Regions:
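Short C-terminal tail/terminal secondary-structure segment
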Residues: 146-147, 221, 232-243
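Active-site helix of classical SDR
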Residues: 124, 158, 166
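Short, small/polar-rich loop/turn modules that mediate ligand/substrate recognition or access, typified
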Residues: 174, 179, 231-233
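Conserved glycine-rich cofactor-binding loop
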Residues: 9, 16-17
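Substrate-binding pocket helix/loop in short-chain dehydrogenase/reductase
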Residues: 100-101, 105-113, 201
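The beta1-alpha1 cofactor-binding region of Rossmann-like NAD(H)/NADP(H)-dependent oxidoreductases
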Residues: 42-43, 63-74, 106, 214-215
């Protein structure tokens, strides 16, 4: 088996579950040493680390609340102490609230934008300062910014901001050979998928199913390798034809 990321190092925020977990496992399967960033669920993060270790890989988990700049700095410090200077950063941490905009509170706004926008901002800021030349930055967005789901105004607004971070940062880091891209999944089997939407979501795809986290991870794995060297500043749809 080929290991296109052998000798590379990666940090994945929100890496303990769902799409982040799948990306962590995928990059590790390609030979990368992986650090998992998580907020609350230590048990899940440790499970990912164990799964990677059992397969012969190197991994570690670090708790951090990325809405606080000092926590982002600490996460990167711990990652570098564990695996060395970073080649790949995946900003995947996210939260969602589903309710009409008129019913959203300031607390809802702060919670969603703290995680999805501010947390990504601080992650990208540290990545821009620390990533090796020729590195990779991958940001999780959502196909919802193209599909316009009602009740997700805060979530979609927070992700729309992130997509613009990607476009601007790709130009800021291009002279160092660093690629910066977003992935926008369609409906995917994660904790965010509500049972009442599952059948309708599956019908949006020509494949008549919702995505598996591994489907999204495959796109990240491509972007992280040398094969993705000429792709930057893009928001790549991974929705199984749903948009």
């Amino acid at each position: 088996m080929e290991y296109p990321l052998r000798g590379k190092t990666a940090l994945i925020t929100g890496g303990s579950r769902g799409i982040g977990r799948a990306i962590a496992l995928g990059l590790a399967s390609y030979g990368a040493a992986v650090v998992i960033g998580y907020v609350k669920n230590e048990a899940r993060a440790r499970e990912v680390v164990k799964t990677i270790a059992d397969a012969g890989g190197k991994s570690a988990a670090v708790q951090a609340d990325l809405s606080r700049p000092t926590e982002a700095i600490r996460l990167f410090d711990e990652a570098e102490r564990t695996v060395g200077a970073l080649d790949i950063v995946v900003a995947n941490a996210a939260d969602i609230v589903v309710k009409p905009l008129a019913d959203c509170t300031e607390e809802d706004y702060d919670r969603i934008f703290d995680t999805n926008t501010k947390g990504v901002f601080f992650t990208l800021k540290e990545a821009a300062r620390r990533l090796k030349d020729g590195g990779r930055i991958i940001v999780s967005s959502t196909g919802g910014t193209r599909m316009f789901f009602p009740g997700q105004s805060l979530y979609l607004g927070s992700k729309g901001a992130v997509e613009q971070f990607v476009r601007a940062l790709s130009w800021e880091l291009g002279n160092r050979g660093i690629t910066v891209n977003a992935i926008s999944p369609g409906p995917t089997e994660t904790d965010m998928m509500q049972d009442r939407y599952r059948d309708k979501a599956a019908a949006m795809s020509p494949f008549n199913r919702i995505g598996d986290p591994a489907d999204i991870a495959a796109v990240a794995m491509f972007l992280a390798t040398d094969a993705g060297r000429w792709v930057t500043g893009q928001n790549i749809g991974a929705g199984g034809g749903a948009f």
